[in-house]
């Protein structure tokens, strides 16, 4: 047995908590927050960010934004777009390692207020004409 499959005290208690009634309630609450965040992001992107496309994620809380049309229309590279988001405090991830030439990955596993704040910043400072 290696240390990768050995259970320590912390992981044992985490496992017990995860399968408790409270753990199930927490997962239900988490799923509701994630669904709210995903629906909000998809609607806002479709309505406010022309040239950016995204599909509803399946089994994850990561969005994969296709910025190909937006970058082309605004004569920006994906690097410039990514840096613009980071400059206003939106930390997102380059999509190229995930086979998206002009894509950005965005994590939505945050409180809804933070997701709204991030998209307001993107709308006001990054995805502008």
Which functions belong to the PLM regions below?
Residues 1-129:
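PLP-dependent class I/II
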């Amino acid at each position: 047995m290696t240390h990768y499959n050995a259970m320590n005290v912390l992981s044992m208690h985490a496992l017990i908590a995860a399968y408790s009634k409270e753990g199930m309630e927490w997962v239900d609450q988490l799923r509701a927050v994630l669904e709210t965040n995903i629906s909000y992001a998809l609607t806002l992107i479709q309505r406010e960010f022309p040239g950016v496309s995204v599909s509803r994620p399946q089994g994850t809380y990561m969005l994969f934004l296709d910025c190909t049309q937006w970058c082309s229309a605004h004569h920006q590279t994906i690097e410039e777009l990514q840096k613009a988001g980071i400059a206003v405090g939106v930390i997102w991830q380059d999509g190229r390692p995930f086979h998206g030439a002009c894509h950005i990955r965005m994590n939505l596993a945050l409180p809804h207020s933070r997701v709204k704040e991030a998209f307001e910043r993107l709308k006001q400072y990054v995805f502008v004409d």
